[in-house]
């Protein structure tokens, strides 16, 4: 079974850019969020009724990706992941009222069952950046943003509540506020953890 690294953090922090930078340095099997390919993402942006379908689609996708990456001979590297989609996005959706209590409970049950069947990632790289940096990065994006810069504090709170439950050796926290697109400071630190 291959190793798995999850890169997590709020929208706009640089998860995809870091995964790309790491992939240029070492051969990883990678998995991305695939916003454009997700059938409910654009629908949800237009109509909040699609909140549950969007969340379940992502949770299922991420579980499928984890299973595939674990089967690879290479170390797996995920842009986001199952844990981020539940602890960050599903909780954010519930807080905003985009998921009802029973819908959120369905997401929780699916996540807990799935996580009990799939090994926890070997390393979770938690990216943080200042709100100003995240706001600027989100403004430059050319894709659908469900979470906004205003959601960053709440999103980070949800992640922190989960992250404190993890063993310290499984977690690498990086403030990437000053990083460029090559992540010259962070890439060596992550590679040293492998």
List PLM regions with ranges.
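Conserved substrate/cofactor phosphate-moiety recognition/catalytic segment
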Residues: 24-67
């Amino acid at each position: 079974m291959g190793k798995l690294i999850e890169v997590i953090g709020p929208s706009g922090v640089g998860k995809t850019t870091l995964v790309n930078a790491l992939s240029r340095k070492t051969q990883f099997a990678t998995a991305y969020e695939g916003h454009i390919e997700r059938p409910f993402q654009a629908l949800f942006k237009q109509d909040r009724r699609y909140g549950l379908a969007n969340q379940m689609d992502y949770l299922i996708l991420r579980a499928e990706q984890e299973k595939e990456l674990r089967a690879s001979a290479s170390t797996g590297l995920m842009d986001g992941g199952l844990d981020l989609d539940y602890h960050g996005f599903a909780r954010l959706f519930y807080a905003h009222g985009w998921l009802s209590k029973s819908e959120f409970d369905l997401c929780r049950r699916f996540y807990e069952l799935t996580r009990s069947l799939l090994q926890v990632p070997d390393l979770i790289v938690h990216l943080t950046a200042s709100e100003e940096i995240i706001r600027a990065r989100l403004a430059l994006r050319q894709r659908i943003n469900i979470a906004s810069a205003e959601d960053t504090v709440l999103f980070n709170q949800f992640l922190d509540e989960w992250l404190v439950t993890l063993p310290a050796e499984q977690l690498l926290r990086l403030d990437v506020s000053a990083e460029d697109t090559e992540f010259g400071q962070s890439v060596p630190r992550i590679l040293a953890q492998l």
